[in-house]
Amino acid sequence: MERKGRERKLPGMKIVMPTPVETPTMNLEDRCLIKLTNESEEIEIAATDLVVLEELGKGGYGIVEKMQHRQSGIIMAVKRIKSSINDQSQKQMLNELDACRRSDCCPQMVRFYGAMFREGDVWICMEVMDTSLDKFYRHAYKIGKHIPEPFIGKMALSVIEGLNFMKEQLNLIHRDVKPSNILLNRHGQVKICDFGISGHLTNSMAKTVQAGCKPYMPPERIDGETKSAYDVRADVWSLGITIIEIAVGTHPYANWKTPFEQLKQVVKEPPPKLPMESGFSVDCQYFVKRCLEKDYNERPKYPELLAMPFMEQARNEKQFSMARFINEILDTVWRR
């Protein structure tokens, strides 16, 4: 007689699905309530009450203008974005709104006031800064000034602290660190902006490859074999390129004519470094060298960078005044 084997019940397996990142929603009107500081009272701002003072910048996303509120005299930067260009642009806009809304307690990120909808555009209202790093360093070199090491250290410290806040508190990677997205004001503050292409991190990795400005991209985002995923160390590379650019007055890579030239120069050739004769300290040169490690596994993340001697010097530097230097350059340029 053939015995039938008993069916063995497998132990129950609990499948844990990752918590999906919520997609920010947009429910805007043609007016919004804003607070200039955490302590100030809310003021209602209507789009029709804003007067354009000057254009601050423009790009594929839209335009940034300096505006003034008629009734209160409040001046702000307003980023006007077409809300219905395409799905990708709308996603970028929602990313920016989401990041801005959650960044209020970070002094190294441009302060978000509010957002409103006006004639097919989304208006993102932010604090106005006095200049961007790309305009600033070019102005400085144009009038015969160079960018001193203490400035570079304090700028890098602010940027890393802002990026670290994005990672730890917002679970975001910026993905477009470059001089035009680093803003300065006459008080000596340095803040990062433009979170439109920032990406959510899954297990500390970002998966979208097309976001960002190619001249500042690290090897792992260009090389076809490795660009499927990357982490915050991609922004560390971009910061290293930014530091060299403002330190020597020009981007460390020549202009690329073809994608192959970019692949060859960034992926295949040694990384750029500060010239030995530039007069920068050993700690500064080592910091930049570590930011530009070709193998991202060897490249430090934010906590390690913040613990380096160059950052410690920037923290403790008391003689150099960011505000004084920024005002000196801006005043000289505007007098010409």
From Swiss-Prot:
Keywords, in A-Z order: ATP-binding, Kinase, Magnesium, Metal-binding, Neurogenesis, Nucleotide-binding, Phosphoprotein, Serine/threonine-protein kinase, Stress response, Transferase, Tyrosine-protein kinase
Effect of gene knockout: Upon infection by P.aeruginosa and E.faecalis, RNAi-mediated knockdown results in a reduced up-regulation of gst-4 and gcs-1 expression. Causes a severe reduction in rnt-1 accumulation in the intestine during oxidative stress mediated by paraquat. RNAi-mediated knockdown in a ced-1 mutant background causes a moderate reduction in germline cell apoptosis during oogenesis in response to oxidative and heat shock stresses. The phenotype is more severe and also affects the response to osmotic stress in a mek-1 and ced-1 mutant background.
SUPFAM superfamilies: Protein kinase-like (PK-like) (SSF56112)
Description of how activity is regulated: Activated by nsy-1-mediated phosphorylation.
GO process terms (BP): antibacterial innate immune response; defense response to fungus; defense response to Gram-negative bacterium; defense response to Gram-positive bacterium; determination of left/right asymmetry in nervous system; innate immune response; MAPK cascade; negative regulation of endoplasmic reticulum stress-induced intrinsic apoptotic signaling pathway
Tissue expression from the record: Expressed in linker cell in males.
Residues the record marks as active site: 176
Domain of life: Eukaryota
Transmembrane keyword on record: no
Induction description: By B.thuringiensis pore-forming toxin Cry5B.
SMART domains per the UniProt record, alphabetical: S_TKc
Domain Protein kinase: 50-311
EC numbers for this chain: 2.7.12.2
A GO term, aspect molecular function: protein tyrosine kinase activity
One Pfam family of this chain: Pkinase
Post-translational modification Phosphothreonine, affected residues: 208
Record-listed Phosphoserine modification sites: 204
Swiss-Prot/TrEMBL cofactor(s): Mg(2+)
InterPro entries: Kinase-like_dom_sf, Prot_kinase_dom, Protein_kinase_ATP_BS, Ser/Thr_kinase_AS
Binding, ATP: 56-64, 79
Catalytic activity: L-seryl-[protein] + ATP = O-phospho-L-seryl-[protein] + ADP + H(+); L-threonyl-[protein] + ATP = O-phospho-L-threonyl-[protein] + ADP + H(+); L-tyrosyl-[protein] + ATP = O-phospho-L-tyrosyl-[protein] + ADP + H(+)
Family per similarity comment: Belongs to the protein kinase superfamily. STE Ser/Thr protein kinase family. MAP kinase kinase subfamily.
Its biological purpose: Dual specificity protein kinase which acts as an essential component of the p38 signal transduction pathway which is also composed of upstream effector nsy-1 and downstream effector pmk-1. May phosphorylate pmk-1. Downstream of CaMKII unc-43 and adapter protein tir-1, plays a role in determining asymmetric cell fates in olfactory AWC neurons during neuronal development. Activation results in the repression of odorant receptor str-2 expression in one of the 2 AWC neurons. Involved in resistance to pathogenic Gram-positive and Gram-negative bacterial and fungal infection.
Subunit organization: Interacts with nsy-1. Interacts with unc-16.
The protein, known as: Dual specificity mitogen-activated protein kinase kinase sek-1
